[in-house]
Amino acid sequence: MKETILEKIVKNKYEWIKFRKKKQPLITFKNHINTKTRNFYNSLKEKNPVFILECKKKSPSLGIIKKNFNLIDIAKIYNKYASAISVLTDEKYFDGKLEFINIVRERVSQPILCKDFFIDPFQIYLARYYNADAILLMLSILDDFQYQKLSKIAKELNMGILTEVNNTSELKRAIKLNANIIGINNRNLHDLSINLNRTRILSSLIPKNIIIISESGITKYKQIRYLSQFVNGFLIGSHLMSEKQLEIGVRSLILGENKICGLTRSCDIEIAEKYGAVYGGLIFAPSSLRKISKNTAKKIIFNNTLRNVGVFQNENIEIVKNIAEELNLYAVQLHGQEDQKYVKKLRQTLSINIQIWKAFSIDSKIPDLNWDHIHKYVLDSQFGGSNKCFNWSILKHQILENVILAGGINSNNCIKASKLNCSGLDLNSGIEVSPGIKDHKKIKSVFQKLRYY
């Protein structure tokens, strides 16, 4: 019978341990182990959901995930958003190293989970020697006796334990073995397929006093919103590592693809970035109370990390093109009576790297959302920037993954809005002091509610 990838990994791990014991005998470092750790369990008892964000260069299923694997840059970003940070240390199959732990740990305040295939006590001592605060114990590769032996050593070293299960049988064992943090792996460790339903099914069998973490296959904010009703948090690695812009990827996953529109000041852009917006809206429509000039836009967006979106209304295509390309906009949003013919011509004219979005003012029904050349749709109230919502009930049972919801969204209704499963929210008048002047406390309030629920 053909060896599974998990069997190959474990087989290699025995060989690695044998080699490492000769190279670095336990007796040479055991007395130098410090048992003062960052509390992994407490870090996962924060407001839900919690996030264990992972540093992973490679995986057996995907190969090289992140070519530019700069741990210092990754740590700097994860430090802003993670509850704990996972570091892959398996060498052969994940291109990891134990030395990675300290590179990350020295730059963050969170506990570090050493993610490896633990089968021998030597590995735990080694992980702690390299300053890991917690380890992963997989019941798919450990029997009860092995688990008890390894967990005893981890506890003696004040290390946290994430106990991973893959099926009902392993879950029952984890509960019997008194695991206080259980990770449900949505990936089949034998054929590497993903099934997110595993989290929903297995979580219902776990006592309430146990922290539950959903692992593998999480790629969308929508999934996090849904699965958060069953678990305390998520371990996410491959999806984030595959993002070209890691920080944007983290914000999108944890908070949704949210946009703050009607930006007129650089200080408001800084706050939008700080609290987790993905897009920044710059309005060039002459009729808007929040309109800005191209020169003002150039000044305020200098060196920011938002994906900037220019909002236009029935504008000459050449003007749209010139502004969009000179400001290097991520997208142009059409907020007038532009038709499919206009969009087609704009697409032929505009740089291929710049997306085209179409906004619709909603009355009582949803318009056609199948236009050619449109990446996203913005559904707004009849009068944009009026701090009024349209009837959201018409959105029920609709597929809204390429829709951004706008119109009167504020700290009082943002949670209700986020449950509609749009890709994100468009915040404008609901977070202002006056047109174009954003209220920083309101922005903070909205994003905190989108983060913890």
Swiss-Prot record:
InterPro entries: Aldolase_TIM, Indole-3-glycerol_P_synth, Indole-3-glycerol_P_synth_dom, Indole-3-GlycerolPSynthase_CS, PRAI_dom, RibuloseP-bd_barrel. Residues 258-453 are annotated as: N-(5'-phosphoribosyl)anthranilate isomerase. Pfam families: IGPS, PRAI. Keywords: Amino-acid biosynthesis, Aromatic amino acid biosynthesis, Decarboxylase, Isomerase, Lyase, Multifunctional enzyme, Tryptophan biosynthesis. Pathway: Amino-acid biosynthesis; L-tryptophan biosynthesis; L-tryptophan from chorismate: step 3/5; Amino-acid biosynthesis; L-tryptophan biosynthesis; L-tryptophan from chorismate: step 4/5. GO terms for molecular function: indole-3-glycerol-phosphate synthase activity; phosphoribosylanthranilate isomerase activity. The keyword Lyase applies. Its EC number is 4.1.1.48, 5.3.1.24. It comes from the Bacteria. Residues 1-257 are annotated as: Indole-3-glycerol phosphate synthase. GO terms for biological process: L-tryptophan biosynthetic process. HAMAP family: IGPS_B, PRAI. Bifunctional enzyme that catalyzes two sequential steps of tryptophan biosynthetic pathway. The first reaction is catalyzed by the isomerase, coded by the TrpF domain; the second reaction is catalyzed by the synthase, coded by the TrpC domain. In the N-terminal section; belongs to the TrpC family. This is Tryptophan biosynthesis protein TrpCF. It comes from Buchnera aphidicola subsp. Diuraphis noxia.
